[in-house]
Design a protein with these regions (language model features):
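Alpha-helix-centered segments that form part of catalytic cores
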Residues: 86-107
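Short catalytic/ligand-binding loop motif for oxyanion handling, primarily in non-cytosolic enzymes
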Residues: 64-67, 111-113, 120-121
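Active-site recognition of the HExxH zinc-binding catalytic motif
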Residues: 102-115, 127
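Amphipathic alpha-helical segments that form well-ordered structural scaffolds
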Residues: 14-21, 104, 126, 130-134
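C-terminal capping/extension segments of zinc metalloprotease domains
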Residues: 29, 49, 140, 152-158
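Hydrophobic (often cysteine-bearing) scaffold residues that line and stabilize catalytic clefts
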Residues: 11, 101, 123
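Post-HExxH zinc-binding segment in Zn-dependent metallohydrolases
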Residues: 120-152
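A metal-dependent hydrolase signature that marks the N-terminal structural subdomain at the beginning
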Residues: 1-74, 79-93
Length: 158
């Protein structure tokens, strides 16, 4: 996979080492660019361009540790209509490496759903669940991706 970076303190080699052990988005390039956030806190930002066959990850600059609430599922509530509550987990990203790993896995799952499963790729909760369960693991497999397609009652981090 072709890897490029315009983030000053993150080289393509460091990016490759950070995602070593993760599945590759075959035929796609990976770009890492700065996110110059406005306001008082950084946030997560990445996208997959299926026409250009690329994954772009934005790393907050300057980098400061930050928290994000990650939705990993929804639970139906009794009553009339389609009522539900989001199941979420708070995550603190302490390093740009953690942000890179989380966002890469999230975007890889979009790639997997479209390119390998042939389904719609707009499954944000599934992609978040996959990234949340796996971004701290040394090795991530296709089996991990298949497990993320089935929501469990609890999420496993680490």
């Amino acid at each position: 996979m072709e890897v490029s970076s315009t983030v000053d303190d993150l080289t393509p080699g460091e990016i490759r080492r950070a995602i070593a052990g993760f599945p590759h988005a075959e035929g796609y390039s990976l770009r890492v660019i700065p996110l110059r956030y406005r306001g008082d806190k950084p946030h997560l930002s990445a996208w997959t361009d299926f026409d250009q066959r690329s994954i772009t990850i934005q790393i907050p600059q300057p980098f400061l540790p930050f928290g994000e609430v990650v939705p990993y599922g929804a639970q139906r509530r009794p009553g009339k209509g389609m009522r539900f509550i989001w199941l979420t987990e708070g995550v603190t990203f302490r390093t740009h490496r953690e942000v890179l790993r989380f966002l890469y896995l999230h975007e890889w799952m979009h790639w997997f759903l479209k390119e390998r499963k042939g389904t719609k790729s707009q499954a944000e909760t599934t992609c978040d669940r996959f990234a949340l369960r796996n971004y701290k693991k040394r090795t991530v497999t296709m089996q991990d991706a298949r497990e993320a397609l089935r929501r469990r009652r609890e999420t496993t981090v680490g």
